[in-house]
Amino acid sequence: MNINVTLIGQTVAFIIFVWFCMKFVWPPLMNAIEERQKRIADGLADADRAVKDLELAQAKATDQLKEAKATANEIIEQANKRKAQIVDEAKAEADAERAKIIAQGKAEIEAERNRVKEDLRKQVAALAIAGAEKILERSIDEAAHSDIVNKLVAEI
């Protein structure tokens, strides 16, 4: 192969071109590539962080939901206990009131019965006195006496 001036000139021009590219073109390209790599790496890191934050938020939301359900169940349980307590208290009050009313009614019935007995005793006594007066006013004969006693028995 022949080495001539043209080949040497082309080689020198190529070396100058490579040097020029290495000096002025290559560093900005490398900076742009490195910046892009950094942005991509930052974007991926942000995406990973966002995924972790999302998972953490979902876990926290799940925990809060479980806690809220537990609190709601506790409140419902307390309400049911309170309801049962109120119902029991109302039943006890109703039973006490019923017993009181029954006792009052029995006392009133007993008092009325005693009053009626007393009235009957007074009436029987009055009738007996009236019968005795009638018997004493009339002459004592067997037929009149029997008739008065029968009338008294019918009135009683």
Curated annotation (Swiss-Prot):
Keywords: ATP synthesis, Cell inner membrane, Cell membrane, CF(0), Hydrogen ion transport, Ion transport, Membrane, Transmembrane, Transmembrane helix, Transport. Disulfide bonds: none annotated. One of its GO terms (molecular function) is proton-transporting ATPase activity, rotational mechanism. It is found in: Cell inner membrane. One of its GO terms (cellular component) is proton-transporting ATP synthase complex. The chain crosses the membrane at residues 5-25. It is a single-pass membrane protein. Its main location: membrane. It holds the Pfam family ATP-synt_B. F(1)F(0) ATP synthase produces ATP from ADP in the presence of a proton or sodium gradient. F-type ATPases consist of two structural domains, F(1) containing the extramembraneous catalytic core and F(0) containing the membrane proton channel, linked together by a central stalk and a peripheral stalk. During catalysis, ATP synthesis in the catalytic domain of F(1) is coupled via a rotary mechanism of the central stalk subunits to proton translocation. F-type ATPases have 2 components, F(1) - the catalytic core - and F(0) - the membrane proton channel. F(1) has five subunits: alpha(3), beta(3), gamma(1), delta(1), epsilon(1). F(0) has three main subunits: a(1), b(2) and c(10-14). The alpha and beta chains form an alternating ring which encloses part of the gamma chain. F(1) is attached to F(0) by a central stalk formed by the gamma and epsilon chains, while a peripheral stalk is formed by the delta and b chains. Belongs to the ATPase B chain family. HAMAP family: ATP_synth_b_bprime. This is ATP synthase subunit b.
